[in-house]
Swiss-Prot record:
<feature type="compositionally biased region" description="Polar residues">
    <location>
        <begin position="1366"/>
        <end position="1375"/>
    </location>
</feature>
<keyword id="KW-0965">Cell junction</keyword>
<dbReference type="GO" id="GO:0051015">
    <property type="term" value="F:actin filament binding"/>
</dbReference>
<keyword id="KW-0493">Microtubule</keyword>
<feature type="region of interest" description="Disordered">
    <location>
        <begin position="673"/>
        <end position="772"/>
    </location>
</feature>
<feature type="compositionally biased region" description="Polar residues">
    <location>
        <begin position="1459"/>
        <end position="1472"/>
    </location>
</feature>
<dbReference type="InterPro" id="IPR036034">
    <property type="entry name" value="PDZ_sf"/>
</dbReference>
<feature type="modified residue" description="Phosphoserine">
    <location>
        <position position="1069"/>
    </location>
</feature>
<dbReference type="InterPro" id="IPR027685">
    <property type="entry name" value="Shroom_fam"/>
</dbReference>
<feature type="region of interest" description="Disordered">
    <location>
        <begin position="1093"/>
        <end position="1115"/>
    </location>
</feature>
<dbReference type="GO" id="GO:0005856">
    <property type="term" value="C:cytoskeleton"/>
</dbReference>
<keyword id="KW-0133">Cell shape</keyword>
<dbReference type="GO" id="GO:0000902">
    <property type="term" value="P:cell morphogenesis"/>
</dbReference>
<feature type="region of interest" description="Disordered">
    <location>
        <begin position="1315"/>
        <end position="1573"/>
    </location>
</feature>
<feature type="modified residue" description="Phosphoserine">
    <location>
        <position position="913"/>
    </location>
</feature>
<keyword id="KW-1003">Cell membrane</keyword>
<dbReference type="GO" id="GO:0005912">
    <property type="term" value="C:adherens junction"/>
</dbReference>
Amino acid sequence: MMRTTEDFHKPSATLNSNTATKGRYIYLEAFLEGGAPWGFTLKGGLEHGEPLIISKVEEGGKADTLSSKLQAGDEVVHINEVTLSSSRKEAVSLVKGSYKTLRLVVRRDVCTDPGHADTGASNFVSPEHLTSGPQHRKAAWSGGVKLRLKHRRSEPAGRPHSWHTTKSGEKQPDASMMQISQGMIGPPWHQSYHSSSSTSDLSNYDHAYLRRSPDQCSSQGSMESLEPSGAYPPCHLSPAKSTGSIDQLSHFHNKRDSAYSSFSTSSSILEYPHPGISGRERSGSMDNTSARGGLLEGMRQADIRYVKTVYDTRRGVSAEYEVNSSALLLQGREARASANGQGYDKWSNIPRGKGVPPPSWSQQCPSSLETATDNLPPKVGAPLPPARSDSYAAFRHRERPSSWSSLDQKRLCRPQANSLGSLKSPFIEEQLHTVLEKSPENSPPVKPKHNYTQKAQPGQPLLPTSIYPVPSLEPHFAQVPQPSVSSNGMLYPALAKESGYIAPQGACNKMATIDENGNQNGSGRPGFAFCQPLEHDLLSPVEKKPEATAKYVPSKVHFCSVPENEEDASLKRHLTPPQGNSPHSNERKSTHSNKPSSHPHSLKCPQAQAWQAGEDKRSSRLSEPWEGDFQEDHNANLWRRLEREGLGQSLSGNFGKTKSAFSSLQNIPESLRRHSSLELGRGTQEGYPGGRPTCAVNTKAEDPGRKAAPDLGSHLDRQVSYPRPEGRTGASASFNSTDPSPEEPPAPSHPHTSSLGRRGPGPGSASALQGFQYGKPHCSVLEKVSKFEQREQGSQRPSVGGSGFGHNYRPHRTVSTSSTSGNDFEETKAHIRFSESAEPLGNGEQHFKNGELKLEEASRQPCGQQLSGGASDSGRGPQRPDARLLRSQSTFQLSSEPEREPEWRDRPGSPESPLLDAPFSRAYRNSIKDAQSRVLGATSFRRRDLELGAPVASRSWRPRPSSAHVGLRSPEASASASPHTPRERHSVTPAEGDLARPVPPAARRGARRRLTPEQKKRSYSEPEKMNEVGIVEEAEPAPLGPQRNGMRFPESSVADRRRLFERDGKACSTLSLSGPELKQFQQSALADYIQRKTGKRPTSAAGCSLQEPGPLRERAQSAYLQPGPAALEGSGLASASSLSSLREPSLQPRREATLLPATVAETQQAPRDRSSSFAGGRRLGERRRGDLLSGANGGTRGTQRGDETPREPSSWGARAGKSMSAEDLLERSDVLAGPVHVRSRSSPATADKRQDVLLGQDSGFGLVKDPCYLAGPGSRSLSCSERGQEEMLPLFHHLTPRWGGSGCKAIGDSSVPSECPGTLDHQRQASRTPCPRPPLAGTQGLVTDTRAAPLTPIGTPLPSAIPSGYCSQDGQTGRQPLPPYTPAMMHRSNGHTLTQPPGPRGCEGDGPEHGVEEGTRKRVSLPQWPPPSRAKWAHAAREDSLPEESSAPDFANLKHYQKQQSLPSLCSTSDPDTPLGAPSTPGRISLRISESVLRDSPPPHEDYEDEVFVRDPHPKATSSPTFEPLPPPPPPPPSQETPVYSMDDFPPPPPHTVCEAQLDSEDPEGPRPSFNKLSKVTIARERHMPGAAHVVGSQTLASRLQTSIKGSEAESTPPSFMSVHAQLAGSLGGQPAPIQTQSLSHDPVSGTQGLEKKVSPDPQKSSEDIRTEALAKEIVHQDKSLADILDPDSRLKTTMDLMEGLFPRDVNLLKENSVKRKAIQRTVSSSGCEGKRNEDKEAVSMLVNCPAYYSVSAPKAELLNKIKEMPAEVNEEEEQADVNEKKAELIGSLTHKLETLQEAKGSLLTDIKLNNALGEEVEALISELCKPNEFDKYRMFIGDLDKVVNLLLSLSGRLARVENVLSGLGEDASNEERSSLYEKRKILAGQHEDARELKENLDRRERVVLGILANYLSEEQLQDYQHFVKMKSTLLIEQRKLDDKIKLGQEQVKCLLESLPSDFIPKAGALALPPNLTSEPIPAGGCTFSGIFPTLTSPL
């Protein structure tokens, strides 16, 4: 370039013509100020195989106003002092990352076009020029560039994550391409010091530069926001932040994103830079790492000011300049030049190193390393940035805090500190793996990433730098390593893993760095690179040893001296990084210098340093608040990394343990692993030290502690659990002992075997093995396990092969990484979790040991684990490709691992490394593509798809039930089992924690990142708080405490975790079923179940009852439900076997899905509810975990659980969405198929339902089940505001506890244990019993006890009260009381529930057994307590609760009333009605928002369940009789859809009354008069505290209704209210009519009619209604042609039937709506005569009820039924004349009803206008408060809401029509017609299912939007928004219903008119016809209804 580095560094105000004209090129520097737009356009780039040139300069733009204008054709060489790799993406990201200023250096071909002539060549010439100008720069750039190029080459492999990268990856073989692709970012750093830096140079490395680099990176500030990526450099976090989860995944491989990487990396580097290389190197090398790190890095780079660590060849010093990317650009350019010249030489090696990280890392074989060394001497100087590592410690602490820390630390670090820091312990304990996995894959990892350092990516190199260069590793390790480990070290391994190519890039850089000073590479990309290098070292003892020892060691040394050095290096790395960090550049440089010569330790030191760097980072991380925790993570991760990369030693000596642990690590997806490495990996990389750093970190006496055997042991133990004692002391000692070269030589001697051999053979390895318990035996076990896993997981675990390959190259870390890429990370996470769980349990050592075996077994089972087996790694080298593919499968894994593998692969042949890299890139890219497609497939939240390891998980899941693997995901469980088995078993016992571990990997594997604003805010990638909720640690329940405490992980990678859980759980859950298969399976099972139980196959049943299968099933399987269940199951149901037994084949997947979601929910919820319900929940979760451990582990409990679970799976599984509760189980014990109910609603419905159910019905149960009651009910209550986010959380939470709590997990709750024996057993019995609910009730009791006990003493009594009858009987009551006990519930209930419910519950206290009996009895005769309880709950929730309570007991038919209440509540809970099962399901989804309150009422849900499944016996028996006798008692709040059930049980109070009462009930303080506002508030509140509000609504409503219905019914039931009530009745009565029909003796019509009459006219029908019914019956009896239309049969489907599950009719919403309407119509109603009013009510109710969609025909249907029974007394003539008269009379009556309906429609339109006005207000408010992108999300959501609702209505109407026609087809219908109809139905059904999925997606978006708005809006405003949204869909549906009813009425009138003789003149005179019919001539003759009816019915 024309300017020296310094010059370049200097800001230039103008386009400098200071052009270095070299040859035909002149370099111009343009300094643009003012911010974007900059006024020029870039085109070409590596991605397109063209030079990156300025295609056009906009006139008048900033670029056009320069003195020396930029010209089209100018090739952009540097941006912000970052040497470009010619990647357009990188350039774009750099430009975008520029804040106020943009510094460009362009090369202009003076000979040809000024701009582009030989841009490509020029690029490389440029570096020379640039280099030549500033020689040091040249060297640095050359080296860096070369490295970068090399890395770039490799990078494509890693980069493939991004599609662009993939493209470039294909071109990667070209060194220059590589250079461009990879050199782009990372290389600059690497090259920076690579060519210019020397070991000694590093000594000159200016820490200040490193330190200040973060600050210096002005870009960093902006990128800092992106930094979260920085936080997750290894993970594709940056991309998550910057681009997307896929990009993030790609970011590893996106060198085109290199700019992002550069930013990210730069930022990272700047932050992590200490380990850095030269400033430039740092930015470059780090960048490379970062680049590998992915967009994350790129983002960071943008955010970061690049510290150009320029190694001044002349000065022999590496100076760190804040290049603002310019240095990087220069470096890149030089790198390019170098790449052409020396760069290529180095690249030949380095490319291999990069392309073939192994060679690169291994020093790319001796030659590569040596060449790297030779070429990289300057670069070695760059490694001085290890000094940076020294400064890294400070830097990491300081710098990171400055840049990464300042922003990321605050944003990521702190969140991570909180997330990772706090999470760290928990994370390490339980969530570390999760976080790691997530962090790499998810933005959430951003925080975790950040925790382990996004910046650490650049820092990762820093880590290696710290790792390898830090001679005074031990001294500084305590401080620096931690940061290195934490951010960089971990990151590095993650990076290395993350990108085989990254590693290559890092390897290249690091290789170059490390090659020169093994450490430097570590610095550049030490952690990651060094990991690989270590393996490479292992692979190439010769080159590796010499260079590893000298330079390569640092990064490779980690592996290099895997056995001895690794251990020692590990320790040293732990310690050395501090050295590196402390010494900073000098020390590091000296270390680098020394390393080659002075450190035998050098080799081991570099390795140790790498380890130490990791540990150092960890240490420093420890130093940082968050670091302490994180260090543990890192230790675990580093340990993993060590195991992976450095585990050679670990694997060798400690490898038995380490390997076990590592194996688990391996099992963790490579990506995860990388991330793990980043997060855990830092610790893991530190390997044992890192893993131990958990201890070491915790000890923070890192140097001594970490260095000390204990530290390592700790880390190892942490990682491996069992090695904890030995690993800690022994392993640590091993590391130290083994660190010596003795092992290293062996390792080097056998690269693959050596790596393993090293791991195994080295003393360190031996020690490690000893420490691990399994030295070589472990390896053999690993091998065996690997074989097992291979066999088991087959191709799924190719990752194992890949791991094996990785293991060979990066056998320890990489292989493990690769192998465990999916599993390893999971395992690592699991390990960490186990460690966390075990450690927290205090059995870390033992656990680890046990876990190791188990992990070995399990891990080994997964290929990843096999990979862990060092020996098997070598043997599996060939499998690597598979592993790579497998790894690829795991997107994250693929990203990291494959790259790594190629590196390792290349390692064998240093020169071929690039080639390998290219193929690897392709293979990797293919893998990535596969993974991406999977991820995309998983976008449906189907973890199954996502779970690359998930399938294994599924497989493993099965074994898991039998083994302790349950806790862990199959990959993790199996793979992780071996290393983590102890933990796993440990976890298994506390299944939750265990599962949580597996789950997190799944989530990560899922690679689907959902980011919520909060998540982004918190740095965890998913927008769904659900992710947070599903914070995905099943373990979270138990480790919830830690995890929630260390929620960093969950928070940071909540989405990932959720995904992990979902995916893993889902995989486990589904076992071998694919998502779709499982979905279908579940749907079918649910449908079958419903069909069996109800006699009718719900159309939506699959989607409705089995909504889980439908929208939900996907959802369930998606993170929310499926994964949760799996996780929950594994975790919640500690005993895998019992879990397995518990699970029914069909239900099992669903249930797992349910469980996992619960787990996920819990985990995810943790962050969400962390402040309130989380704290309690977390503790509870922990307790619960303990309980689970004690209880779940307990054979009885386990067995019981097993017994119970099978049923529970049925009822529960089906009910996952419903959040089955003990009550549910009890209620539905007879219909155990209940599981079909599991997810009646789609994700939203399920989430809501679950939430509500958990809160309400299952609330008690959920409480028990939910590790955190708070999470359950509390979360639920919180969920109203956080509903969207929390909703799922609670659901998951609840599901988790609920799952476990179902019969086991709930018991597993801390409080459950005590009550567990009796209650649980009872529960289980109940569960097994045909009455699943009572058991659930018992569980609820337990739950209450568990949740409440931990939370409140009352909880215990409550549980006892609630457990059986209460809960089961009044799912709502039980649940409601329980939820109150949960913090959220309590808050929701205002504590009243807590206090009040106990009484009722106390009564019910005998409940567990009573619950079973009661639950059973409940069907027969619901005990009074539930209603009172419910009332009490309502009381608790509301002040009205007492009246409610008193009134509830007042009900004579309390049972019925309760049932009614329960049913209605249930209905609400389960959406309008589960009986509506199928139709209800979809409604349920929508209802879930509004319905959540409804659902909250457990009774309704429970009743509903009863109704659906037990409904036939119960409703018919109680319903029918109750219906009529009970008509007087008002049903529970109509809003809860009580009407339907009320009708079933007894006639519901007038809709108005009911609604009014409900409103009042719902609004404790809201008086009836304020219905409009109240309804709105109620709805909001409903959402807020679905259980309480709803319960209140139900009970209070019921009580009030009872008391006031009679008095106020007449006067207060206006048509609109009626209409609402009627609607409820309709949804419950009409839509559930079929159910009613089945349930009630009366067919739906009569039931509906009765409901209508009872509802509208109060218990008494208006005379007109009665007359209409009688007329209809008589007419139908006499004129069968009109039977269909006049007697709407339940068999006829209506639009509402099909809409039922999707948009659960929120009675509250309707209530609100009706309230408004009521207010409007009240005058009309009251003004009207009583008869008229009754008529109106009837009409409205009919309208609302639309019994069979025909509101008008509701009474008629009843009449028709009666008519059928009426004897034909009159002779035909008389009959005919009489019939005609009756028809005329009926026409008049129908006409009147139509008028009423028209009035109702008018009021509805008014409501719609009002709601739209409200929506406009809300929108205006939101537009002012929210960010534009958030506002866009809101607008898009609202717009899509309309579209989706209308689409569903349209499709539902068409489908209903077709189905009605089909059902009406006679036997004479032609096959052609029938087949045509079937085809239409099939098509429509498919479209409807798609629309339902859209609805699910919409529900997810709704939660996201709600989460966003919750941050801006006040509670009242939020309630307005929620009310608006709920009412929007509700009003649309109601409008359609009214239209359908009106249409039906008109059709009925029309048919009646047509059936009348043309000459007929009614005696009463002319017929009063509806306006639209008056003009129509009345055709003579009868109209065949059959022909018309289907048509009529269909719209209805």
